[in-house]
């Protein structure tokens, strides 16, 4: 089976990540593709059993943030026909999704209320059955695919913490069983389709993938290998292997993606939207992309698409803006001290590395749109901030 990969957008595929799914090293990413981390766990079953059902599990241990674009997936094949996968996504501020997709098929039936099935195109064609679910970090979700006769395979997802169960749908294939070979669990950061994306824009995530079991739990796979996407983000990934699971850690050293909140509970904001030169201001929290920050391992504070919080000078009253990160280090790391900030967990201040001065709400004015500045650190409420968590 040729490994193919359907991403969150039904009509979009990328060969670079697809080659990694069955253990083949991906090529260097093209310049027009963003640089994001990816990790893979490959499995094998002893004795090549005929599998009429397989159950996987995913526990997202720390939520990377509602504005994160991350896909946790279980890929597999059939004894006839092409491949499939199912998993869960965080969709960049849109509704979160469970999905089950099969290549080169044309018939599908929806499952539980709220699910739907649709065709997709791109690198081949197929069917995808989906359901929106605001899944919960820390809960273990099982994903079961089972033969239902006459080539139909159904996918069911269960939240083991609550007992809730959801059938995503049933898809007709030419197969009679699930292949015991070629199973891969992977984590994809699909901001790769943003040409500006870098390793340091991406939020930290860690997910526990339980080893697959088949035929009602009577056979269990083992981990045969692990790998990463092999790009500049590789050093920021880690896969921890145990007897019954792997934990895939990505964007290690970065925080999750979320709000930076300050005086009056208002948010650090890129005024009017994300772009180079935009004023950094205080504004009511909206959950928008212009308030979705990552505290990066290089000391920068970043919005999506490689934009950084930056000081325009070093003196008291110097303007603070959102600037192109323009990182020249590996993976887009920033070395410009004007774009680097130190967070004090005791004083709750954000201190600019170039000046040693604090991010400040001038005069304590909490009116929406108040432009932020640098000022000598004084410990006042107008210099205190809460930031996205690191783990």
Give residue ranges: language-model regions:
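Flexible glycan-contacting loops in extracellular carbohydrate-active proteins
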Residues: 170-196
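Secretory targeting and sorting signals
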Residues: 1-30
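Short, aromatic/His-centered strand-loop micro-motif at the edge of beta-sheets
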Residues: 118-142
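Activation corresponds to long, low-complexity, non-globular regions
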Residues: 32-53, 57-67, 186-256
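Lectin-like carbohydrate-binding module/patch detector with strong preference for beta-trefoil
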Residues: 253-391
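Secretory/extracellular carbohydrate-interaction modules
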Residues: 31-117, 130
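Residues within well-ordered beta-strands of beta-sheet-rich folds
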Residues: 53-59, 140-146, 154-156, 310, ...
């Amino acid at each position: 089976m040729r490994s193919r990969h359907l991403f969150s957008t039904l009509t979009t595929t990328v060969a670079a990540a697809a080659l990694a799914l069955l253990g083949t090293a991906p090529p260097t990413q093209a310049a027009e593709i963003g640089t994001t981390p990816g990790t893979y766990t490959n499995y094998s079953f002893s004795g090549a059993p005929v599998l009429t059902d397989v159950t996987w599990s995913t526990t997202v241990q720390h939520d990377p943030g509602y504005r994160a674009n991350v896909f946790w997936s279980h890929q597999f094949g059939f004894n006839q026909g092409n491949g499939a996968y199912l998993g869960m996504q965080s969709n960049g501020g849109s509704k979160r999704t469970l999905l089950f997709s099969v290549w080169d098929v044309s018939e599908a039936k929806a499952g539980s209320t709220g699910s739907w099935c649709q065709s997709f195109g791109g690198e081949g064609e197929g069917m995808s059955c989906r359901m929106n679910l605001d899944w919960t970090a820390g809960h273990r979700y099982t994903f079961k695919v089972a033969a239902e006769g006459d080539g139909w395979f159904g996918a069911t997802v269960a939240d083991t913490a609550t007992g809730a169960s959801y059938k995503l749908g049933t898809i007709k294939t030419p197969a009679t069983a699930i292949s015991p070979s070629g199973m891969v669990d992977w984590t994809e950061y699909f901001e790769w389709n943003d040409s500006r994306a870098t390793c340091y824009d991406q939020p930290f995530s860690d997910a526990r993938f339980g080893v697959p079991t088949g035929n009602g739990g009577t056979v269990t796979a083992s981990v045969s290998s692990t790998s990463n996407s092999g790009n500049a983000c590789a050093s920021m990934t880690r896969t921890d292997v145990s007897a019954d699971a792997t934990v895939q850690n990505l964007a290690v050293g970065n925080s999750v993606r979320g709000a930076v909140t300050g005086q009056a509970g208002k948010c650090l904001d890129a005024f009017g939207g994300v772009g180079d030169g935009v004023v950094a201001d205080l504004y009511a929290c909206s959950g928008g992309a212009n308030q979705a920050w990552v505290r990066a391992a290089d000391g920068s504070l970043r919005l999506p698409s490689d934009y950084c919080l930056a000081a325009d000078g070093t003196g008291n009253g110097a303007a603070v803006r959102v600037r192109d990160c323009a990182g020249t280090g590996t993976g887009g790391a920033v070395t410009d001290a004007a774009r680097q900030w130190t967070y004090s967990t005791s004083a709750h201040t954000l201190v600019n590395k170039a000046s040693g001065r604090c991010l400040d709400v001038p005069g304590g004015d909490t009116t929406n749109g108040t432009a932020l500045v640098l000022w000598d650190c004084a410990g006042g409420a107008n210099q205190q901030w809460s930031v996205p968590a690191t783990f």
